[in-house]
A protein has these predicted regions:
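Catalytic alpha/beta core domains of metabolic enzymes, predominantly
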Residues: 127-132, 142-251
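Soluble or luminal CAZymes and related metallo-dependent hydrolases
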Residues: 26, 58, 120, 172, ...
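Active-site beta->alpha loop and helix N-cap motifs at the rims of alpha/beta catalytic domains
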Residues: 2-149, 300-303
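C-terminal alpha-helical cap/extension of soluble enzyme domains
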Residues: 7-13, 37, 217-305
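Short secondary-structure capping/turn micro-motifs that flank functional sites
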Residues: 50-51, 112-113, 175, 199, ...
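Ser/Thr-centered flexible coil motifs
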Residues: 55, 151, 279-282
Length: 305
Protein backbone atom coordinates (compact mmCIF):
# COMPACT_ATOMS: atom_id res chain seq x y z
CA UNK A 1 0.00 0.00 0.00
CA UNK A 2 1.12 3.55 -0.67
CA UNK A 3 2.12 6.09 1.92
CA UNK A 4 0.25 9.09 3.24
CA UNK A 5 1.86 12.50 2.80
CA UNK A 6 4.72 13.35 5.13
CA UNK A 7 4.44 16.56 7.13
CA UNK A 8 2.17 18.16 9.72
CA UNK A 9 -1.12 16.61 10.88
CA UNK A 10 -3.05 18.49 13.60
CA UNK A 11 -4.91 16.33 16.09
CA UNK A 12 -8.24 17.92 15.36
CA UNK A 13 -10.50 19.21 18.12
CA UNK A 14 -14.28 18.82 18.07
CA UNK A 15 -16.28 22.04 18.58
CA UNK A 16 -19.62 21.80 20.36
CA UNK A 17 -22.64 24.07 20.45
CA UNK A 18 -23.96 25.51 23.70
CA UNK A 19 -26.50 22.65 23.85
CA UNK A 20 -23.72 20.05 23.45
CA UNK A 21 -24.12 19.04 19.81
CA UNK A 22 -21.24 18.94 17.35
CA UNK A 23 -20.84 22.39 15.77
CA UNK A 24 -20.60 21.39 12.10
CA UNK A 25 -20.08 24.93 10.84
CA UNK A 26 -17.06 25.32 13.12
CA UNK A 27 -15.76 21.91 11.99
CA UNK A 28 -15.68 23.19 8.41
CA UNK A 29 -13.94 26.41 9.48
CA UNK A 30 -11.27 24.50 11.40
CA UNK A 31 -10.52 22.40 8.32
CA UNK A 32 -10.17 25.61 6.29
CA UNK A 33 -7.77 26.98 8.91
CA UNK A 34 -5.61 23.87 8.61
CA UNK A 35 -5.62 24.12 4.82
CA UNK A 36 -4.80 27.83 4.80
CA UNK A 37 -1.79 27.33 7.08
CA UNK A 38 -0.32 24.59 4.93
CA UNK A 39 -1.11 21.40 6.83
CA UNK A 40 -0.34 18.21 4.96
CA UNK A 41 -3.08 16.24 6.66
CA UNK A 42 -5.54 16.01 9.55
CA UNK A 43 -5.91 13.42 12.28
CA UNK A 44 -9.64 13.50 13.00
CA UNK A 45 -11.51 11.48 15.63
CA UNK A 46 -8.58 11.20 18.03
CA UNK A 47 -8.17 11.92 21.74
CA UNK A 48 -8.04 15.70 21.14
CA UNK A 49 -11.32 15.25 19.24
CA UNK A 50 -12.76 13.92 22.53
CA UNK A 51 -13.53 10.65 20.75
CA UNK A 52 -14.11 8.78 24.00
CA UNK A 53 -16.95 11.22 24.68
CA UNK A 54 -18.52 11.06 21.21
CA UNK A 55 -21.24 8.61 20.24
CA UNK A 56 -20.50 6.13 17.47
CA UNK A 57 -22.71 8.12 15.10
CA UNK A 58 -20.88 11.34 15.96
CA UNK A 59 -17.50 9.70 15.36
CA UNK A 60 -18.55 8.41 11.95
CA UNK A 61 -20.22 11.69 10.98
CA UNK A 62 -17.18 13.67 12.09
CA UNK A 63 -14.79 11.59 9.98
CA UNK A 64 -17.08 11.94 6.96
CA UNK A 65 -17.48 15.69 7.43
CA UNK A 66 -13.72 16.27 7.65
CA UNK A 67 -13.14 14.21 4.50
CA UNK A 68 -15.76 16.28 2.69
CA UNK A 69 -14.39 19.61 3.95
CA UNK A 70 -10.79 18.69 3.15
CA UNK A 71 -11.90 17.92 -0.41
CA UNK A 72 -8.67 16.21 -1.36
CA UNK A 73 -6.46 19.14 -0.33
CA UNK A 74 -5.06 17.28 2.68
CA UNK A 75 -4.85 13.66 3.75
CA UNK A 76 -7.41 12.72 6.39
CA UNK A 77 -6.82 9.89 8.85
CA UNK A 78 -9.22 8.97 11.63
CA UNK A 79 -9.64 6.57 14.51
CA UNK A 80 -12.75 6.04 16.60
CA UNK A 81 -12.70 2.50 18.02
CA UNK A 82 -13.30 2.92 21.73
CA UNK A 83 -15.21 -0.26 22.63
CA UNK A 84 -13.79 -3.00 24.83
CA UNK A 85 -14.61 -6.00 22.66
CA UNK A 86 -12.71 -6.58 19.43
CA UNK A 87 -15.97 -7.43 17.65
CA UNK A 88 -17.40 -4.00 18.46
CA UNK A 89 -14.12 -2.33 17.53
CA UNK A 90 -14.19 -4.03 14.14
CA UNK A 91 -17.67 -2.64 13.52
CA UNK A 92 -16.54 0.85 14.52
CA UNK A 93 -13.44 0.72 12.31
CA UNK A 94 -15.40 -0.56 9.32
CA UNK A 95 -17.74 2.39 9.61
CA UNK A 96 -14.86 4.87 9.82
CA UNK A 97 -13.19 3.23 6.81
CA UNK A 98 -16.40 3.65 4.81
CA UNK A 99 -16.24 7.45 5.21
CA UNK A 100 -13.41 7.67 2.68
CA UNK A 101 -10.53 8.54 5.01
CA UNK A 102 -7.04 7.97 3.63
CA UNK A 103 -6.18 5.66 6.52
CA UNK A 104 -7.89 4.25 9.59
CA UNK A 105 -6.00 4.54 12.86
CA UNK A 106 -5.89 1.74 15.42
CA UNK A 107 -5.28 2.62 19.07
CA UNK A 108 -2.65 0.47 20.75
CA UNK A 109 -4.38 0.41 24.15
CA UNK A 110 -7.67 -0.83 22.65
CA UNK A 111 -6.03 -3.99 21.32
CA UNK A 112 -4.89 -5.31 24.70
CA UNK A 113 -5.58 -4.55 28.34
CA UNK A 114 -2.85 -3.04 30.48
CA UNK A 115 -1.98 -6.40 32.02
CA UNK A 116 -2.08 -8.32 28.73
CA UNK A 117 0.96 -9.26 26.67
CA UNK A 118 2.16 -8.08 23.29
CA UNK A 119 1.06 -11.45 21.92
CA UNK A 120 -2.54 -10.52 22.75
CA UNK A 121 -2.14 -7.13 21.07
CA UNK A 122 -0.64 -8.68 17.94
CA UNK A 123 -3.35 -11.34 17.74
CA UNK A 124 -6.12 -8.75 18.05
CA UNK A 125 -4.38 -6.48 15.55
CA UNK A 126 -4.36 -9.31 13.03
CA UNK A 127 -8.04 -10.02 13.70
CA UNK A 128 -8.85 -6.43 12.84
CA UNK A 129 -6.73 -6.52 9.69
CA UNK A 130 -8.45 -9.68 8.50
CA UNK A 131 -11.91 -8.29 9.25
CA UNK A 132 -11.22 -4.93 7.57
CA UNK A 133 -9.37 -5.85 4.36
CA UNK A 134 -8.03 -3.54 1.67
CA UNK A 135 -7.85 -0.60 4.08
CA UNK A 136 -4.59 1.19 5.01
CA UNK A 137 -4.00 1.60 8.73
CA UNK A 138 -2.03 3.67 11.18
CA UNK A 139 -1.31 3.01 14.85
CA UNK A 140 -1.70 5.58 17.64
CA UNK A 141 -0.15 5.38 21.11
CA UNK A 142 -3.15 7.14 22.64
CA UNK A 143 -2.53 8.20 26.27
CA UNK A 144 -6.13 7.45 27.36
CA UNK A 145 -7.25 5.27 29.08
CA UNK A 146 -3.63 4.15 29.43
CA UNK A 147 -0.57 4.70 27.27
CA UNK A 148 0.70 1.54 25.61
CA UNK A 149 3.98 2.19 23.84
CA UNK A 150 4.80 -0.03 20.90
CA UNK A 151 7.61 -2.47 21.59
CA UNK A 152 10.09 -3.61 18.93
CA UNK A 153 8.20 -6.91 18.80
CA UNK A 154 4.93 -5.15 17.98
CA UNK A 155 6.57 -2.78 15.50
CA UNK A 156 8.11 -5.70 13.62
CA UNK A 157 4.78 -7.53 13.56
CA UNK A 158 3.09 -4.42 12.19
CA UNK A 159 5.70 -3.98 9.48
CA UNK A 160 5.45 -7.61 8.42
CA UNK A 161 1.73 -7.25 7.66
CA UNK A 162 2.35 -4.60 5.00
CA UNK A 163 -0.91 -2.92 6.05
CA UNK A 164 0.37 -0.12 8.27
CA UNK A 165 1.32 3.22 6.74
CA UNK A 166 2.30 5.17 9.84
CA UNK A 167 2.66 5.42 13.60
CA UNK A 168 1.52 8.38 15.67
CA UNK A 169 4.30 8.22 18.23
CA UNK A 170 3.71 9.61 21.72
CA UNK A 171 6.80 8.32 23.53
CA UNK A 172 8.31 11.87 23.48
CA UNK A 173 11.78 10.32 23.61
CA UNK A 174 14.12 11.32 20.77
CA UNK A 175 16.47 8.40 21.37
CA UNK A 176 13.65 5.86 21.30
CA UNK A 177 12.18 7.46 18.18
CA UNK A 178 15.56 7.16 16.44
CA UNK A 179 15.65 3.48 17.38
CA UNK A 180 12.14 3.01 15.99
CA UNK A 181 13.05 4.74 12.73
CA UNK A 182 16.03 2.41 12.32
CA UNK A 183 13.94 -0.67 13.08
CA UNK A 184 11.18 0.32 10.67
CA UNK A 185 13.69 1.23 7.95
CA UNK A 186 11.15 3.06 5.79
CA UNK A 187 8.49 0.35 6.01
CA UNK A 188 6.20 2.48 8.20
CA UNK A 189 6.18 6.27 8.54
CA UNK A 190 6.60 7.82 11.97
CA UNK A 191 4.97 11.06 13.15
CA UNK A 192 6.21 12.67 16.36
CA UNK A 193 3.72 14.34 18.74
CA UNK A 194 6.29 16.31 20.75
CA UNK A 195 7.51 19.81 19.81
CA UNK A 196 10.63 19.73 21.99
CA UNK A 197 12.04 16.72 20.13
CA UNK A 198 10.56 17.37 16.69
CA UNK A 199 13.67 18.82 15.04
CA UNK A 200 15.98 16.17 16.47
CA UNK A 201 13.69 13.40 15.29
CA UNK A 202 13.40 14.92 11.81
CA UNK A 203 17.18 14.74 11.57
CA UNK A 204 16.97 11.09 12.62
CA UNK A 205 14.44 10.25 9.92
CA UNK A 206 10.97 10.91 11.35
CA UNK A 207 8.37 11.76 8.73
CA UNK A 208 6.39 14.53 10.36
CA UNK A 209 4.47 15.94 13.31
CA UNK A 210 1.05 15.07 14.65
CA UNK A 211 0.33 16.71 17.97
CA UNK A 212 -1.61 19.30 19.92
CA UNK A 213 0.50 22.32 18.95
CA UNK A 214 -0.39 21.92 15.28
CA UNK A 215 -3.79 23.30 16.31
CA UNK A 216 -2.19 26.61 17.29
CA UNK A 217 0.49 27.42 14.72
CA UNK A 218 0.70 24.63 12.15
CA UNK A 219 2.44 26.94 9.69
CA UNK A 220 5.47 27.22 11.99
CA UNK A 221 5.72 23.44 12.25
CA UNK A 222 5.28 23.17 8.48
CA UNK A 223 8.15 25.63 7.99
CA UNK A 224 10.37 23.58 10.27
CA UNK A 225 9.54 20.34 8.48
CA UNK A 226 10.20 21.81 5.04
CA UNK A 227 13.24 23.94 5.81
CA UNK A 228 15.26 22.28 8.58
CA UNK A 229 17.85 20.99 6.11
CA UNK A 230 18.04 24.16 3.99
CA UNK A 231 18.26 26.59 6.92
CA UNK A 232 19.66 24.57 9.86
CA UNK A 233 20.58 27.53 12.09
CA UNK A 234 17.19 29.17 11.76
CA UNK A 235 15.52 25.80 12.23
CA UNK A 236 17.37 25.29 15.51
CA UNK A 237 16.25 28.69 16.78
CA UNK A 238 12.66 28.08 15.69
CA UNK A 239 12.73 24.68 17.37
CA UNK A 240 13.70 26.32 20.66
CA UNK A 241 10.80 28.77 20.37
CA UNK A 242 8.33 26.03 19.52
CA UNK A 243 9.54 23.96 22.45
CA UNK A 244 8.86 26.75 24.96
CA UNK A 245 5.56 27.69 23.31
CA UNK A 246 4.40 24.08 23.63
CA UNK A 247 4.22 24.44 27.41
CA UNK A 248 0.68 25.77 26.90
CA UNK A 249 -0.37 22.18 26.18
CA UNK A 250 -1.11 21.98 29.90
CA UNK A 251 -3.53 24.92 29.83
CA UNK A 252 -6.85 23.10 29.89
CA UNK A 253 -6.72 21.21 26.60
CA UNK A 254 -8.81 21.19 24.44
CA UNK A 255 -10.61 24.28 25.78
CA UNK A 256 -7.41 26.30 25.27
CA UNK A 257 -7.33 25.41 21.58
CA UNK A 258 -10.97 26.46 21.24
CA UNK A 259 -10.19 29.77 22.93
CA UNK A 260 -7.25 30.30 20.56
CA UNK A 261 -9.46 29.49 17.57
CA UNK A 262 -11.86 32.21 18.71
CA UNK A 263 -8.98 34.69 18.86
CA UNK A 264 -8.22 33.79 15.25
CA UNK A 265 -11.78 34.55 14.16
CA UNK A 266 -13.15 30.99 14.19
CA UNK A 267 -16.13 31.30 16.54
CA UNK A 268 -17.05 28.37 18.76
CA UNK A 269 -18.09 27.63 22.31
CA UNK A 270 -15.35 26.68 24.78
CA UNK A 271 -17.55 23.76 25.79
CA UNK A 272 -15.81 20.39 26.11
CA UNK A 273 -17.01 16.95 27.09
CA UNK A 274 -13.73 15.59 28.48
CA UNK A 275 -13.10 18.51 30.86
CA UNK A 276 -15.10 21.26 32.54
CA UNK A 277 -13.84 24.29 30.62
CA UNK A 278 -15.01 26.69 33.32
CA UNK A 279 -12.82 25.14 36.02
CA UNK A 280 -9.97 23.58 34.01
CA UNK A 281 -9.31 26.59 31.76
CA UNK A 282 -8.93 29.53 34.13
CA UNK A 283 -7.98 33.20 33.94
CA UNK A 284 -4.24 32.52 33.94
CA UNK A 285 -4.62 29.92 31.22
CA UNK A 286 -6.42 32.49 29.07
CA UNK A 287 -3.63 34.95 29.73
CA UNK A 288 -1.09 32.39 28.55
CA UNK A 289 -3.01 31.79 25.32
CA UNK A 290 -3.35 35.55 24.75
CA UNK A 291 0.43 35.82 25.08
CA UNK A 292 0.94 32.81 22.82
CA UNK A 293 -0.98 34.61 20.07
CA UNK A 294 1.38 37.59 20.41
CA UNK A 295 4.40 35.29 20.36
CA UNK A 296 3.17 33.56 17.22
CA UNK A 297 3.03 36.90 15.43
CA UNK A 298 6.54 37.77 16.59
CA UNK A 299 7.91 34.43 15.36
CA UNK A 300 6.21 34.77 11.98
CA UNK A 301 7.75 38.21 11.47
CA UNK A 302 11.15 36.84 12.51
CA UNK A 303 10.87 34.04 9.94
CA UNK A 304 10.41 36.62 7.17
CA UNK A 305 13.80 38.21 7.81
Amino acid sequence: MGKIANGVYPVMITPFTADNHVDWKAVDQIVEFYAKLGCDGIFAVCQSSEMFFLSEEERVQLAARVVKAAAGRMCVVASGHISDSIEDQIRELRRVAATGVDAVVMISNRLAAKDESDDVLIANMKRVLEAVPDVPFGMYECPHPYKRLLTPKVLEAMAETGRFQFIKDTCCDAKLIAERVRLLNGRIQLFNANCATFLETLKDGADGFSGIMANYHPDLLVWLHRNYQKQPEKARELSAMLSVMSLVEGCGHPAAVKYHMNLLGIPMELKCRMIDAETRFDRLDRHAIDDLLVMEGVVREWLKR
